[in-house]
A protein has these predicted regions:
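Bacterial N-terminal signal peptides
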Residues: 9-18
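Sec/Tat signal peptide C-region and signal peptidase I cleavage site
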Residues: 19-23
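Hydrophobic small-molecule pocket/channel-lining residues, especially in calycin-type beta-barrels
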Residues: 24-195
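Bacterial N-terminal signal peptides that target proteins for export
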Residues: 1-9
Length: 195
């Protein structure tokens, strides 16, 4: 009768050791990979200047200037970006928050956002060279629109964008376009000691 008890005690001791060893090895958090680090192009504060195309907000709607700011910061240990924006679009204030991250399972980038107009966006992105392409859906007041959003990095501090919308993927038309420019971070003035 002692043999099964000893064997059971031995098996439990080995299992406990394996569990403890595994727990100790997993205390070092993983580091973001190169795909995640590509999101760094969006980190910082940017000014946005653009235009909503004539007719984009309904028949005979005029073109409207877009001005505002975007700001993105690393979150979740550097695995994603939390971004906020505040725009004036033809006198209407748009403000929202979004989350960008890399999904290693699908090998695509993801974006989820919400704004003060009740719009909810869900997009999937890819990057090729300096061009990011985002496709997905946006729902406003229960109506779903398809979106194509393309950004082209033109320098380390700016990118140009175009956005198209439609009720189906085949009916998308240009909605807006413009340019984001990184705001230079001012360095604090340094004073020299009195002589």
């Amino acid at each position: 009768m002692r043999r099964p008890t000893r064997l059971l005690a031995f098996v439990l001791a080995c299992a406990s050791t394996a569990i403890v060893a595994r727990a100790q090895s997993s205390t070092t958090p993983p580091k973001p990979g190169p795909e995640v680090r590509k999101l760094a192009v969006m980190v910082g504060k940017f000014t946005n200047e653009g235009e909503v195309k004539a007719g984009a907000m309904g028949p005979n709607s005029p073109a409207m200037k877009v001005n505002g700011t975007d700001e993105c910061r690393w979150t979740a240990g550097g695995f994603g970006l939390t971004c906020t924006y505040a725009y004036d679009v033809g006198g209407t204030k748009w403000a929202g928050t979004g989350l960008f991250y890399y999904d290693s399972t699908s090998k695509k980038y993801r974006y989820h956002g919400v704004n003060n107009l009740g719009e909810i966006e869900d997009q999937t992105g890819t990057v090729s060279g300096d061009t990011w392409t985002w496709t997905g859906e946006s729902s406003i007041s229960g109506k779903v629109f398809h979106i194509l959003y393309v950004t082209k990095v033109v320098s380390k501090d700016s990118y140009e964008y175009t956005e198209s919308w439609g009720e189906s993927e085949n009916s998308m038309e240009p909605f807006m376009g413009g340019k984001d420019t990184r705001v230079a971070i001012s360095k604090p003035a340094t004073s020299k000691p009195a002589q």
